[in-house]
């Protein structure tokens, strides 16, 4: 179909609604309402629900009439009361690419690893709720959030959108965020289904992995997020999985997602992820995204019409596609709570973002109690990282350009085009430190002159070096090094002043050749629009750090399953028959890989320091059928209030391929001297294996060693429990 015809297709007929619209009866279930509405739709109206338009337009294709200016747009059908679908990116805030919507701004939330580092379910929910509310207030009823891909490699350019390496932690935290988004009557996606764990050649490469390993790692994260969050839509991924494109993957979309997991929502494609019409529809894809711009054809228009007419795609499947979209619109409030454009509460959003950054920043190292900053400090040298202007953020479709504090604080950093521009959010740690410490002289140097930086550091009581690393969608990092000779800057400053603290604003783990030469390191990730204030509060002790790593921090690339991956770096992806062999580690992602290979990381999964101390003990474990319950006590033995994150791991019976699994955790805030009893029920599937032949989860009979731990590498107490063989429902 020609482009002009395609753009003329939307049906926005201005007719009065019928006097009787039974599908608007809120006493009915979403399924019943969808069935009643589907029965009244014409074939053209049905097809209208199965493709979105690019909501921004291009230099050749104008922005669709009615679109607010965003990632996608599906016109409504007024005669039936069907609302338009206004789709906005993404998972760290409502985007406004290039300021296309004049005056619109949103809260730039901290990155996914920051939220995950909080290990705080309620905080993840609240962050999602903030994004959902701002989406709704800006007129968007679909938010392309819910990124739950596992972080298999620290060089993945999109790790800043994800929630770590463990399926239980990632699935739980992203599921809670999705639940928060949808509490504001905004549909959320869950993405990118599945194994979209690297960006290099993402449109072409094949993720190779066994079925059992896939279910016990990436798919388990999706399954847990699905159970908790009930996302309206699942976005299929660009890449191939075992040679089959994600949006044509019958096994993943039909057999696993819709049949085994009984998912009632709809599957939408990623932008540019569709390669066929009937094949994709039969494999489980329900809605094509902006095909007129990103795909070779609008497969879900003329090609799908022909396939339905010819019986290649049965009408039952065609109706099922439409019904799933309608059901999600009913289930998550798009019909009953239409959006009302209004001003957002930017100050409330900033405070929400700041709280996430405070709980999600991780104190990696703190020798000789270097932090919090001593009250005796009279002069501080702050060096590097744009700390005088703001904090780093990630690039690509999730980039939030405009916040309550304004636009980019440092325009012109390359790249300035996709997946840039590089955005420095205007939240200056330097200014926040000066506000918090009015009687301290705080000098700033940008770090470009290492000699001057060393001179300033030597003259100060304390030096604080801010180091940044930009990462973005569609490209991977070439290696784990900090860019722009920042390692040399840190070495120089630390040599000049042994009381040097390093604050990292990075996509994830980086090499730290200087780690033993600085007393303190704070990992702030991409801390969002409240990041400057959060960092200052953590450094000064106004806030006690409580973040714990959601990923293992390798010493360098030699400890990774794939030390070298050809083609990584900031360069365009090229077509090819490439594959990534995830079978190397299989389900042993992150700390499981390190445990299996007996490797010692720089910092283990779950690691995080505090300004107080905690004692854990009294572990008792009870098993009844497939339910394992652990009880223990936690006491704050230090001088100030703080939050502990006791973690529970299980070492499976001898001979098992996976040596260790996180089975649960609890985050609790305790006053000095306070002791509390805690009970944690393990997620049953963390105790089980996926039987690929029988297509079910089974618990093997044997002795399981449950560890109460501070991190994956620091068990405090172990208790054994015997489990009987069982099959999970």
Annotate the PLM regions:
Residues 1-3:
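N-terminal export leaders
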Residues 715-719:
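Extracellular and select intracellular beta-sandwich modules with Ser/Thr-enriched
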Residues 14-690, 698-714, 728:
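Glycoside hydrolase catalytic-domain context in secreted enzymes
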Residues 720-728:
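Short beta-strand edge segments in extracellular beta-sheet folds
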């Amino acid at each position: 179909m020609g482009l002009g015809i395609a753009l003329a297709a939307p049906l926005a007929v201005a007719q009065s609604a019928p006097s009787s619209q039974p599908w608007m009866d809120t006493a009915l279930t979403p399924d019943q309402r969808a069935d009643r509405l589907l029965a009244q739709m014409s074939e053209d109206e049905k097809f209208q629900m199965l493709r979105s338009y690019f909501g921004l337009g291009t230099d050749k294709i104008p922005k669709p009439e009615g679109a607010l200016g965003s990632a996608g747009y599906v016109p409504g059908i007024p005669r039936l009361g069907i609302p338009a679908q206004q789709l906005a990116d993404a998972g760290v805030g409502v985007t406004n690419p290039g300021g296309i919507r004049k005056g619109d701004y949103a809260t730039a939330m901290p990155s996914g690893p920051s939220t995950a580092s909080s290990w705080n379910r309620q905080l993840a929910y609240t962050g999602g709720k903030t994004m959902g509310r701002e989406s709704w207030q800006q007129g968007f009823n679909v938010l392309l959030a819910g990124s739950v891909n596992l972080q298999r490699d620290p060089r993945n350019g999109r790790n800043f959108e994800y929630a770590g390496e463990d399926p239980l932690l990632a699935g739980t935290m992203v599921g809670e965020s999705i639940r928060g988004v949808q509490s504001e009557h905004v549909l959320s996606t869950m993405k990118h289904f599945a194994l979209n764990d690297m960006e290099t050649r993402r449109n072409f490469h094949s993720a190779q992995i066994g079925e059992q390993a896939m279910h016990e790692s990436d798919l388990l994260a999706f399954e847990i997020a699905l159970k908790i969050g009930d996302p309206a839509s699942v976005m299929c991924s660009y890449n191939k999985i075992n040679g089959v494109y994600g949006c044509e993957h019958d096994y993943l979309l039909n057999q696993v997602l819709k049949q085994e997991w009984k998912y009632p929502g709809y599957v939408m494609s990623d932008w540019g992820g569709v390669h066929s019409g009937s094949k994709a529809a039969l494999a489980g894809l329900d809605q094509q995204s902006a095909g007129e711009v990103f795909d070779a054809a609008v497969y879900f228009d003329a090609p799908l019409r022909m396939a339905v007419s010819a019986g290649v795609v049965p009408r039952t499947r065609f109706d099922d596609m439409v019904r799933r979209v309608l059901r999600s619109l009913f289930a998550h409030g798009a019909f009953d709570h239409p959006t009302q454009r209004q001003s957002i509460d930017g100050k409330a959003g900033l405070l929400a973002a700041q709280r996430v950054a405070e709980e999600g920043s991780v104190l990696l190292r703190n020798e000789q109690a270097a932090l919090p900053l001593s009250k005796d400090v009279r002069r501080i040298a702050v060096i590097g990282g744009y700390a005088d202007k703001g904090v780093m953020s990630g690039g690509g479709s999730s980039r939030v350009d405009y916040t309550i504090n304004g636009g980019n604080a440092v325009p012109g950093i390359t790249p300035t085009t996709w997946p840039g521009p590089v955005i420095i959010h205007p939240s200056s740690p330097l200014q926040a430190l000066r506000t918090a410490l009015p009687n301290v002289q705080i000098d700033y140097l940008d770090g470009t002159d290492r000699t001057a930086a060393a001179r300033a550091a030597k003259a100060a009581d304390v030096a604080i070096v801010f180091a940044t690393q930009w990462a973005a969608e569609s490209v991977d990092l070439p290696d784990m090094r900090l860019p722009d000779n920042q390692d040399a800057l840190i070495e120089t400053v630390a040599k000049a002043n042994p009381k040097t603290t390093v604050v990292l604003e990075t996509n994830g783990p980086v090499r730290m050749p200087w780690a033993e030469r600085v007393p303190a390191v704070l990992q702030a990730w991409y801390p969002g629009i409240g990041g400057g204030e959060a960092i200052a509060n953590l450094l000064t002790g106004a806030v006690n750090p409580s973040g714990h790593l959601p990923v293992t921090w390798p010493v360098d690339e030699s400890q990774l399953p794939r030390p070298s991956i050809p083609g990584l770096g900031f360069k365009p992806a090229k077509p090819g028959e490439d594959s990534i062999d995830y079978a190397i580690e299989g389900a042993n992602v992150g700390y499981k890989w390190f445990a299996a290979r007996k490797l010692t990381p720089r910092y283990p999964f779950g690691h995080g320091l505090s300004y107080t101390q905690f004692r854990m003990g009294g572990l008792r474990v009870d098993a009844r059928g497939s339910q394992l319950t652990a009880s223990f006590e936690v006491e704050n033995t230090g001088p100030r209030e703080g939050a502990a994150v006791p973690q529970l791991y299980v070492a499976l019976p001898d001979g098992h391929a996976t040596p260790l699994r996180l089975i649960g955790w609890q985050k609790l805030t305790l006053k000095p001297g306070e002791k509390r009893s805690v009970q944690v029920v393990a997620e049953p599937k963390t105790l089980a294996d996926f039987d690929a032949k029988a297509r079910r989860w089974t618990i093997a009979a044997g002795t399981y060693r449950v560890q109460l731990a501070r991190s994956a590498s620091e068990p405090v107490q172990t208790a054994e429990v015997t489990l009987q063989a069982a099959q999970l429902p």
